[in-house]
UniProtKB/Swiss-Prot annotation:
<dbReference type="Pfam" id="PF01386">
    <property type="entry name" value="Ribosomal_L25p"/>
</dbReference>
<dbReference type="InterPro" id="IPR020056">
    <property type="entry name" value="Rbsml_bL25/Gln-tRNA_synth_N"/>
</dbReference>
<dbReference type="InterPro" id="IPR011035">
    <property type="entry name" value="Ribosomal_bL25/Gln-tRNA_synth"/>
</dbReference>
<comment type="subunit">
    <text>Part of the 50S ribosomal subunit; part of the 5S rRNA/L5/L18/L25 subcomplex. Contacts the 5S rRNA. Binds to the 5S rRNA independently of L5 and L18.</text>
</comment>
<dbReference type="InterPro" id="IPR020055">
    <property type="entry name" value="Ribosomal_bL25_short"/>
</dbReference>
<protein>
    <recommendedName>
        <fullName>Large ribosomal subunit protein bL25</fullName>
    </recommendedName>
</protein>
<keyword id="KW-0689">Ribosomal protein</keyword>
<keyword id="KW-0694">RNA-binding</keyword>
<comment type="similarity">
    <text>Belongs to the bacterial ribosomal protein bL25 family.</text>
</comment>
<dbReference type="GO" id="GO:0008097">
    <property type="term" value="F:5S rRNA binding"/>
</dbReference>
<dbReference type="GO" id="GO:0022625">
    <property type="term" value="C:cytosolic large ribosomal subunit"/>
</dbReference>
<comment type="function">
    <text>This is one of the proteins that binds to the 5S RNA in the ribosome where it forms part of the central protuberance.</text>
</comment>
<dbReference type="GO" id="GO:0003735">
    <property type="term" value="F:structural constituent of ribosome"/>
</dbReference>
<dbReference type="GO" id="GO:0006412">
    <property type="term" value="P:translation"/>
</dbReference>
<dbReference type="InterPro" id="IPR020930">
    <property type="entry name" value="Ribosomal_uL5_bac-type"/>
</dbReference>
<dbReference type="InterPro" id="IPR001021">
    <property type="entry name" value="Ribosomal_bL25_long"/>
</dbReference>
<dbReference type="InterPro" id="IPR029751">
    <property type="entry name" value="Ribosomal_L25_dom"/>
</dbReference>
Amino acid sequence: MSYTIQAQTRTEIGKGSSRRLRHAGKVPAVIYGQGKEPVSIVFEHKDIINIQANEDFYTSVVTIVLDGKEVGVRAQAMQRHVFKPIIEHVDFVYA
C-alpha cells in the first residue's frame, strides 16, 4: 500500500515554534540521510495519525509531497505523547 502526506517546509526551528505547531494540530518532522542536507517539514496531524496505525507504514516507502515535489522517504523514528494519542515528531530518511 502506498501512503502520501502533504507537507510544507518549516521556516521556524526550535522548541517554541514546534510547540505552536503542535497546538495548531500539526506535526513537526525532519527528513535526512543520503548525504543530503536535513529538511525540516510540517504536516497535519490528521494526515498521519490513521496511516501510522498500519504496520506496513514503517516498512514501506512513504511519498511526501513537499512544496509540490514528491519525495520518497521511510519512517525512522516517531515520538509520541506519553498518554494522549498524539504524535509529537517524526524522523524520516530518504528512501
